[in-house]
């Protein structure tokens, strides 16, 4: 199982120039599972070639915020006419409602559940429920409840060789840690840390982690996966990374970057 990081930033922009060369662009949350499953649909999706976009059959959306869905309308528009079957968008009922009301509403973007025809759409919805897993080609995706400002999910993704957990945007909660600590074959734990410690009040309001709280939450972990961190705000990326090292360095966190790959084999 191959989990490719298409985007994992908390915003846009690029890293500083080095030796006169442009820095790497930051891309928002989007991850490619093997070749056919997309986990979130942020701006990282835009870097995939068209033939790779065409292979994506399933999109799992953690929640309705723009940085996790913004590439979905354009992706569907790009490949819909050249596919033989619709792309299935898996999400909470509340997230599906938000997509219908605010994105695919014929005002912001066409409704691809009606194009080119009701009987032959480019997109179909599949509602998710927490702890109700879906198996696709030997990979099982189990939705995990998240604690965010809108209804949200994380995902436990597993195959015969092992598994990973992607928290999505969340303040981890008791149910989250019960799930994580019950996974014997957990290879990777992907958590977000969006803000610096000086912005802790904003982090709490926005329901994102800051480094001190990340360290506090990690003390609840009873398994030993590789810890991966995402969603750092580009404007404070270096400061957030330093604070993560200072407060959670004993857990050997890895700050993920666009282009990284997590293999489970």
Residue ranges and their predicted role:
Residues 37, 58, 139, 162-164, ...:
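Structural motif
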Residues 171-261:
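Cap/insert and terminal regions of metallo-dependent hydrolase folds
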Residues 3, 31, 40, 63, ...:
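Divalent metal-coordination and catalytic microenvironments
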Residues 8-9, 36, 41-43, 64, ...:
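Active-site metal-binding loops of divalent metal-dependent hydrolases
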Residues 93-152, 159-160, 250-264:
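Metallo-beta-lactamase
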Residues 44-91, 186-187:
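Active-site metal-binding motif and surrounding structural segment of the metallo-beta-lactamase
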Residues 1-52, 152-169:
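Conserved beta-strand hairpin/beta-sheet module of binuclear metal-dependent hydrolase folds
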Residues 87-94, 228-230:
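Short internal beta-strands
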């Amino acid at each position: 199982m191959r989990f490719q990081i298409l985007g994992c930033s908390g915003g846009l922009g690029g890293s500083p120039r080095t030796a006169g060369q442009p820095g790497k662009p930051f891309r928002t949350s989007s991850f490619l599972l093997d070749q056919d499953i997309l986990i979130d649909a942020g701006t990282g999706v835009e870097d995939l070639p068209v033939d790779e976009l065409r292979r994506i059959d399933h999109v799992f959306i953690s929640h309705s915020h723009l940085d996790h869905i913004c590439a979905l309308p354009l992706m569907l528009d790009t490949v819909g006419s050249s596919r033989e079957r619709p792309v299935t968008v898996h999400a909470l009922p509340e997230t599906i409602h938000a997509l219908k009301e605010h994105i695919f509403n014929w005002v912001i973007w066409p409704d691809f559940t009606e194009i080119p025809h009701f009987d032959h759409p480019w997109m179909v919805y599949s509602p998710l429920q927490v702890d109700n897993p879906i198996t696709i080609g030997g990979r099982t995706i189990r939705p995990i409840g998240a604690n965010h400002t809108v209804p949200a999910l994380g995902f436990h993704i597993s195959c015969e060789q092992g598994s990973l957990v992607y928290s999505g945007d969340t303040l981890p909660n008791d149910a989250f840690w019960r799930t994580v600590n019950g996974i014997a074959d957990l290879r990777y734990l992907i958590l977000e840390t969006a803000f610096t410690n000086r912005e802790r009040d904003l982090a709490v309001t926005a329901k994102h982690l800051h480094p001190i709280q990340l360290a506090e939450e990690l003390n609840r972990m009873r398994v030993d996966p590789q810890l991966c961190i995402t969603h750092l705000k580009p404007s404070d990326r270096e400061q957030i990374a330093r604070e993560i090292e200072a407060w959670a360095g004993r857990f050997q966190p890895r700050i993920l970057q666009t282009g990284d790959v997590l293999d489970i084999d």
